[in-house]
Amino acid sequence: MTTRNPNQPVSYPIFTVRWIAVHTLAVPSVFFLGAIAAMQFIHR
């Protein structure tokens, strides 16, 4: 049992760190893009 089975991620154990790094960049950028797109339609 020395082969890499898919139940044990040995190749990438820092998957959660990459997930946090992606979402700390993706969530604010999507929020600001939505806010800027919404501001295009607001004419006071």
Curated annotation (Swiss-Prot):
Listed cofactors: heme b
GO CC annotation: photosystem II reaction center; plasma membrane-derived thylakoid membrane
UniProt record, GO biological process: photosynthetic electron transport chain
Binding-site positions, heme: H23
Segments passing through the bilayer: 19-35
InterPro entries, A to Z: PSII_cyt_b559_bsu (IPR006241), PSII_cyt_b559_CS (IPR006216), PSII_cyt_b559_N (IPR013081)
Subcellular location: Cellular thylakoid membrane
Domain of life: Bacteria
UniProt KW keywords: Electron transport, Heme, Iron, Membrane, Metal-binding, Photosynthesis, Photosystem II, Thylakoid, Transmembrane, Transmembrane helix, Transport
Cofactor mode of binding and number, as noted: With its partner (PsbE) binds heme. PSII binds additional chlorophylls, carotenoids and specific lipids.
Membrane topology: Single-pass membrane protein
Family: Belongs to the PsbE/PsbF family.
Protein name: Cytochrome b559 subunit beta
Species this chain originates from: Cyanothece sp. (strain PCC 7425 / ATCC 29141)
